[in-house]
Swiss-Prot record:
F-type ATPases have 2 components, F(1) - the catalytic core - and F(0) - the membrane proton channel. F(1) has five subunits: alpha(3), beta(3), gamma(1), delta(1), epsilon(1). F(0) has four main subunits: a(1), b(1), b'(1) and c(10-14). The alpha and beta chains form an alternating ring which encloses part of the gamma chain. F(1) is attached to F(0) by a central stalk formed by the gamma and epsilon chains, while a peripheral stalk is formed by the delta, b and b' chains. In plastids the F-type ATPase is also known as CF(1)CF(0). The record marks 61 as: Reversibly protonated during proton transport. It comes from Thalassiosira pseudonana. This is ATP synthase subunit c, chloroplastic. Belongs to the ATPase C chain family. It is found in: Plastid, Chloroplast thylakoid membrane. Pfam families: ATP-synt_C. HAMAP family: ATP_synth_c_bact. PANTHER family: ATP SYNTHASE LIPID-BINDING PROTEIN, MITOCHONDRIAL, ATPASE PROTEIN 9.
Length: 82
């Protein structure tokens, strides 16, 4: 029974980090593309666009870090083992 719990924890950790990276990865690509397009249209607004982009990228990256924390908790501080 303990080996089943360990195997399920490893699979869940892999899914947690994998799924946590997909959404922010797509979002970061879209945000960067739109920022480049906005800077190309309005070069004078480059500083404002860049600041907003960096802030939004940090928020998106936080989601991936939360997934990593969950995966590490499942692997090393496994709450399912007694």
């Amino acid at each position: 029974m303990d080996s089943i719990i360990s195997a399920a924890s490893v699979i869940a950790a892999g899914l947690a980090i994998g799924l946590a990276a997909i959404g922010p990865g797509i979002g970061q690509g879209n945000a960067a593309g739109q920022a480049v397009e906005g800077i190309a249209r309005q070069p004078e607004a480059e500083n404002k666009i860049r600041g907003t982009l960096l802030l939004s990228l940090a928020f998106m990256e936080a989601l991936t870090i939360y997934g990593l924390v969950v995966a590490l908790a499942l692997l090393f501080a496994n709450p399912f083992n007694s």
